[in-house]
Amino acid sequence: MSTPERTADGRYIIVKGRRWRAQDPVLPEALTAPLLSALGTARSRLSRRHQLNDEQTAVLRQRVTWAKEGLGERGTPWWELTEDERLARARDRLERLARRDGAVREGGR
C-alpha cells in the first residue's frame, strides 16, 4: 500500500482530495499495531451491520472511536498535546478496548 500524501505540516493526509487527520507520528509500533488491528476488525464487522443488532453496532462504533482516538485521528489534535499526554491517551484507549473485549467474552456477546 502506498503512503498517502501529507500536508506540509504533517498533520493531515490527503486521500481522494479530502484532508484527514494523520496518525500521531510519536506513537511506537507497540501501540499503533494493536490499535490499527482493533480499528480494522471493528470496521470489518461494521461492514456486515445488517447482521448485527443495535447494541452490537453501537459497541463496534465505540471501538472505532477508541481506536481512532488512540491513534490521534480523533479527539484533541495530537499536536495540541504533550508527548506524554499523547502516549497516555493511546495506552488508555488500548486499555478500554481490552476491557471491552473481556466484557464481551464474559457476557457471551
Report residues per predicted region:
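Extended, charge-rich alpha-helical interface modules
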Residues: 2-109
